Amino acid sequence: YYTMFGPDDARKQKIQDPTTHEGIRIQMLFGCPFAMSAVMMRSEAFRCSGVQFRDTMAEDYQFWVDLSDHMHMANIPEHLFFYRRWENQLSTSQLDRQTLSAQAIQRDLLRTTLGMTLTDEESRIYTQMNLRVGTLRRDELTTYRGLLKRLYRANSERRAYDCLLYTS
């Protein structure tokens, strides 16, 4: 949970990421479930995991995906952190590169956990859905619906995620 604000925001945006480890793992299929600056953890747990911070555009996202296999994670359900957006921050000025990096992480996660490989069209729509940008055309909704069905079926077969949480 955190509150995001920026120079052109008429109001603050309250972000509520999942609070449970399983909910966080599911959220990782769609994006990073943490505000990096607000994270606390024991350094010993991190050192014992053997996970290394990778040098990529979405390094925090990849870090949490890697670390989620080694430790239990949670978000505190209170808005205790303010995240300020500004024009020149890396995630804004390098959005295209960061999006490509996040797409690669998501494709790898879908492949390793659910055995899914996305077509180029599915990948484009998946990204558009995750970023909540633009408007999907009517014909894209069919692809979107099919993609969601594939995600559900793949999880039903592999049981990688809690089915009750996965459908909510």
Where are these regions (language model features)?
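Conserved donor NDP-sugar-binding/catalytic core segment of glycosyltransferases
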Residues: 1-12
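Conserved nucleotide-sugar donor-binding catalytic segment
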Residues: 11-108, 112-128
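Glycine-rich phosphate/pyrophosphate-binding loop
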Residues: 126-156
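Flexible helix-coil transition and linker loops at the boundaries of alpha-helical arrays
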Residues: 157-162
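Conserved small/polar residues in nucleotide/adenosyl-binding loops
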Residues: 166-167
